[in-house]
Design a protein with these regions (language model features):
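Catalytic cysteine-centered active-site loop
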Residues: 6-59
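Hydrophobic beta-strand signal
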Residues: 62-64
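Intrinsically disordered, low-complexity
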Residues: 1-10, 99-107
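Aromatic- and glycine-rich peptidoglycan recognition patches
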Residues: 52-55, 76-107
Length: 107
């Protein structure tokens, strides 16, 4: 819910709110609201997370993209995620199929 509430906020590289986000800053702060500490790096979030198969994705799981991993979003269900995409765009809901999928973790 926290991440969804940031929809429309601008992307800012290295930012972790409150008015701008990068992808790992958004996931880091969203999960901190649930008492989970994550590093501010998509690659490190993947490296330290509990890996799960794509077939077992549940809302709230973190989904990762590219090789090497350079993007992360929060899975919403129905093949969609909320994420901070890149400069010039804003936090948005997108299909996870729009980028090369690399894996998932459950914090």
């Amino acid at each position: 819910e926290f991440a969804l509430a940031q929809s429309g906020d601008r992307y800012v590289w290295g930012a972790s709110g409150p008015d701008g986000w990068d992808c790992s800053g958004l996931t880091m702060v969203a999960w901190s609201k649930a008492g989970v500490s994550l590093p501010h790096s998509s690659r490190m979030q993947y490296a330290t997370g509990n890996k799960i198969p794509r077939s077992e994705l549940q809302p709230g799981d973190l989904v990762y993209f590219y090789s090497p991993i350079s993007h992360v979003g929060i899975y919403l269900g129905d093949g969609r995620m909320v994420h901070a995409p890149n400069p010039g765009r804003r936090v948005e809901i997108s299909p996870i199929s729009q980028m090369p999928y690399a894996g998932a973790t459950r914090p």
